Amino acid sequence: MQMIAEIYYERGTIVVKGDAHVPHAKFDSRSGTYRALAFRYRDIIEYFESNGIEFVDNAADPIPTPYFDAEISLRDYQEKALERWLVDKRGCIVLPTGSGKTHVAMAAINELSTPTLIVVPTLALAEQWKERLGIFGEEYVGEFSGRIKELKPLTVSTYDSAYVNAEKLGNRFMLLIFDEVHHLPAESYVQIAQMSIAPFRLGLTATFEREDGRHEILKEVVGGKVFELFPDSLAGKHLAKYTIKRIFVPLAEDERVEYEKREKVYKQFLRARGITLRRAEDFNKIVMASGYDERAYEALRAWEEARRIAFNSKNKIRKLREILERHRKDKIIIFTRHNELVYRISKVFLIPAITHRTSREEREEILEGFRTGRFRAIVSSQVLDEGIDVPDANVGVIMSGSGSAREYIQRLGRILRPSKGKKEAVLYELISRGTGEVNTARRRKNAAKGAA
């Protein structure tokens, strides 16, 4: 007679006692048990049920959760996204910034009424989620972070806190929602998903793919893409119509001389070492070598200085002045890659600046001033690229940035949020002519095509 299998949760893993075969598990001869990472919980349960294997489930310890019946109305594409996800209750929804990914997730919570852990990149995003989740009842909303540790039916945590406490959280929630899910494949963060038994999983992002290819891991620990829309699909109806204007700006003569000097050092190093840059990994080898190879270090410094010159050119500042004059009645967000240019623009044009150094209180005050019209422009490094709700804006200016699709789409999304009476949005890209920034802009352009 077959012994009834017993399932336990132990420190991010599932332990099964009994003589039944357990898929995805390894047998531990010392304890006579099978052990698997906790995310295999659903697979193991389904295997036992489909094969008529009796079992006792002592793994789950879910937080008691009420039945939710909030009024949540969805747009047509949000309904389709939710329907696709509900088929298996696993997978990632890819929607443009400003199109209501959070709204879809809240509808999923409403459908399942099960203890839910929402994982977000920043505390600022945690605050936004807690506010939105209030429609289910503030008494059911908690935060588990470095500053607060409360487990409620709907708990919001940062990736950092969820990773550090993955073992503790692993059997308390049945639904995991990963906001900005492209962060999850990092070697540390992926353990949040691997060490949880949650049978239901939802990933949200505007850009699913990662340049390092690690997004493939999401298919196993969260689920693949179940629904995807790009900005052009929603422009004019659910998002503002937009145009992209690329302006090529020459370097000043003194900048040109310095740029070419730095570029020469870098290219001579590549030729001397026979290095051809085809992928990000090729450049990363130079970065690694710079720790012990003086020539590699000098080449990397020359490359960084050349980029700084291209990103921060004087003529870009002059062109920005023209754009600010042209759009003096519009709301403008200026994006840069580095804080140095943020503070320079803030000082020259008396525009409020938001960087990682800006306190939460000051950031909220600036964004409120932007919302009410007290400020018509703000300038930021990468802080506003992701997650933070930015008030209505219809003009964006990219002073400098990377060539990644994610950064581009997120910056574009900042000016596409629909609002009453909003006219066509404009995104300017200022590019230093004859520099490596041209190639960076080309990659952004390709990203734009992919978003069409």
Swiss-Prot record:
ATP binds at residues 95-102. A motif (DEAH box) lies at residues 179-182. The lineage of its organism: Archaea, Methanobacteriati, Methanobacteriota, Archaeoglobi, Archaeoglobales. Conventional DNA helicases unwind DNA by binding to a ssDNA overhang of dsDNA and then translocating on this strand with cycles of ATP binding and hydrolysis to 'unzip' the dsDNA. XPB is believed to be an unconventional DNA helicase principally because it translocates in a 3'-5' direction along dsDNA instead of ssDNA, thus it is referred to as a DNA translocase. It comes from the Archaea. Residues 251-312 are annotated as: ThM region. SMART domains: DEXDc, HELICc. Residues 232-239 are annotated as: Flexible hinge region. It comes from Archaeoglobus fulgidus (strain ATCC 49558 / DSM 4304 / JCM 9628 / NBRC 100126 / VC-16). Residues 316-452 form the Helicase C-terminal domain. Pfam families: Helicase_C (PF00271), ResIII (PF04851), XPB_DRD (PF18458). The gene is xpb. GO terms for molecular function: ATP binding; catalytic activity, acting on DNA; DNA binding; helicase activity; hydrolase activity. Residues 82-226 form the Helicase ATP-binding domain. The N-terminus (residues 1-217) binds dsDNA with an abasic nucleotide but not DNA with 5-hydroxyl-cytidine (a non-distorting lesion) or undamaged single-stranded (ss) or double-stranded (ds) DNA. The DRD domain (residues 1-60) structurally resembles the mismatch recognition domain of MutS. The C-terminus (residues 236-434) binds ssDNA and dsDNA. The C-terminus binds Bax1. The N- and C-terminal domains are joined by a flexible hinge region which allows the two domains to rotate and form either an open conformation (no ATPase activity) or closed (has ATPase) activity. This is DNA 3'-5' translocase XPB.
